[in-house]
């Protein structure tokens, strides 16, 4: 029996002025939304974690779940979760600010119930 093709969520591209392109998924599962809600409410954080720790974890969580690829200054796009997360952790303050703005913009448009940090 032939397999049905898997549903692929639509993706949206966001370009910066330096040849960079961030591609974000257009869908979030109910389980992902619930897990994000627990992080935002502090339920899935380590004991003693600060508000800033929670904010950073929420940002990283959305980044992990939504980013399909990230092209930086026209270089080969990063696609694996490991590469993407590693690059995020070495991102400059300006790059992080740009990423946060894109995640907020994307969530506002596609997931109004998900409030990005």
Language model: regions and residue ranges:
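Short acidic-hydrophobic surface loop/beta-edge motif
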Residues: 9-19
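Short Lys/Arg-rich cationic patches that frequently serve as NLS/NoLS or arginine-rich RNA/DNA-binding motifs
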Residues: 1-9
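Short, surface-exposed, charged amphipathic helix/loop patches that serve as local interaction elements
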Residues: 20, 25-117
């Amino acid at each position: 029996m032939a397999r049905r093709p898997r549903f692929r969520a639509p993706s949206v591209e966001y370009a910066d002025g330096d040849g960079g392109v961030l591609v974000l998924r257009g869908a979030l599962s109910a389980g992902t939304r619930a897990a994000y809600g627990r992080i935002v409410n502090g339920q899935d954080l380590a004991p003693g974690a600060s508000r800033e720790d929670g904010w950073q974890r929420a940002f990283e969580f959305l980044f992990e779940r939504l980013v399909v690829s990230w092209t930086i200054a026209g270089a080969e796009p990063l696609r694996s979760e490991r590469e993407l997360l590693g690059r995020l952790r070495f991102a400059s303050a300006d790059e992080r600010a740009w990423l946060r703005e894109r995640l907020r913009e994307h969530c506002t448009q596609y997931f109004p119930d998900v409030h990005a940090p």
